Amino acid sequence: MLANYTRSAKALSALLQREGVEDTQVLDAIAQIPRHIFVGDVLQHKAYQNTALPIGQGQTISQPYIVARMTELLQLAGVRDKVLEIGTGSGYQTAILAKIFTKVYSVERIKALQWQAKRRLHQLDLYNVAMKHGDGWQGWESQAPFNGIIVTAAAAKIPQDLLAQLADGGVLLAPIGEQEQKLTMVIRNGNNYTEHVIAPVRFVPLVAGDIE
């Protein structure tokens, strides 16, 4: 299967389309990105299943449907260019974003994961991504504002620093809650922030600080 990952990735894209993902750019990105390089060798046989998988350090690579749906929501909201990702993790979501948006900034608190993700993105010739090892709660102030912000770990509430770094008219997507999490879209209009609950989800927690 892995020797012919293109067929497997296309099959995954077709599955996500049947599950309700409609954006053709997102589906094309899923079909083009080899998900198996973002997981360990022992789990590569599961790489093209629609399921989350462990990647070490207590973290996971998100379910492909969630990756596709969150990316699609940014597209539908009109985000086109500058996107901040909080929680690089394996780099799979980063790669999908890089296929669609002009410039992607990604922050990862665990340095080992950040370096692994950077190597994978270079392997795929994705050079429109800037990566940083740091505390995701703080965002990336020096590169703000961002038209879109996507948070790939759950917080009890959205960190204020991230809201402040959202451009006027920009869109933030994040899983909110502790025991019961809900994917939430926040749209900024001047100093007003409007929240829309999208769906129940399950993510690892967004932890403050960073790890060397």
Swiss-Prot record:
One GO BP annotation of this record: methylation
An annotated Gene Ontology molecular function: protein-L-isoaspartate (D-aspartate) O-methyltransferase activity
Keyword hit for Protease: no
E.C. number(s) listed in UniProt: 2.1.1.77
Main location: cytoplasm
EC top class, as a word: transferase
Keyword Lyase: no
Reactions that this protein is recorded to catalyse: [protein]-L-isoaspartate + S-adenosyl-L-methionine = [protein]-L-isoaspartate alpha-methyl ester + S-adenosyl-L-homocysteine
Cellular component annotations (GO), alphabetically ordered: cytoplasm
Taxonomy, superkingdom: Bacteria
Subcellular location: Cytoplasm
Keywords for this protein: Cytoplasm, Methyltransferase, S-adenosyl-L-methionine, Transferase
Its biological purpose: Catalyzes the methyl esterification of L-isoaspartyl residues in peptides and proteins that result from spontaneous decomposition of normal L-aspartyl and L-asparaginyl residues. It plays a role in the repair and/or degradation of damaged proteins.
Family that this chain belongs to: Belongs to the methyltransferase superfamily. L-isoaspartyl/D-aspartyl protein methyltransferase family.
Name used for this protein in its record: Protein-L-isoaspartate O-methyltransferase
Organism expressing this protein natively: Pseudoalteromonas translucida (strain TAC 125)
Organism phylogeny: Bacteria, Pseudomonadati, Pseudomonadota, Gammaproteobacteria, Alteromonadales
Underlying gene: pcm
